[in-house]
């Protein structure tokens, strides 16, 4: 393991020195660095994941070491995640490498551009900050105004209800990351709030929402009013 650790540290030191040189010459420069994609080939076949010196684990260790020593002005792009999205057999192109030293396929270029542009955009504040949600058949199964509290489905022992609860948990995690939550629903407000107040399995609570609009006005008008209250349309997702 000591020999592998030495190789990994030596490999990472090259990048660490490069970051340092960039930061010295360009003050306040934000560096975007792509992490290694773990190769899809396995030099030891099915045993590759069992040994620290395998090719795949070597690149995993490099990625982890880079992350462990990341300066504050360096942001990593997890290309291994994006390679998994499209499939690593589609990500790599050996013929492209031998012809022009391009290790990735043309299929992967779109994913790379998308991932990189999104990360850079978020750094400059170009990201969605407010999520507008409907209620019926969105946060629970059924229609609260027709089915009542007992009739809507957010039952953790029911497959459909479990899916709604999982969705609510994900929305809750977005709030924890700083996303503003709002409700826009065609409903009677007092009825629409009942599940949040009385259903024991609701993950989301009324206090999780910065704005709660439930009425019979058209949704476009309601969303426009929410946008005015929360600094414009560009920050919205729904």
Put a short name on every predicted segment.
Residues 1-133, 139-140, 145-151, 202:
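Extracellular glycan-modifying ectodomains
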Residues 104-111, 162-163, 167, 176:
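Extended, H/D-rich, highly charged conserved domains that either
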Residues 144-169:
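Basic, amphipathic juxtamembrane/active-site segments
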Residues 166-197:
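Substrate-recognition element of Asp-dependent hydrolases with the DxDx(T/V) motif
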Residues 182, 194-211, 226:
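Hydrophobic, small-residue-rich alpha-helical packing segments that form membrane-like cores
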Residues 185, 212-216:
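Conserved beta-strand/loop elements of the cytosolic catalytic core of P-type E1-E2 ATPases, chiefly
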Residues 217-221:
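Short acidic loop-to-helix transition motifs that present clustered carboxylates
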Residues 223-238:
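Conserved Lys-Pro-Asp/Glu-containing loop-to-beta segment of HAD-superfamily phosphomonoesterases
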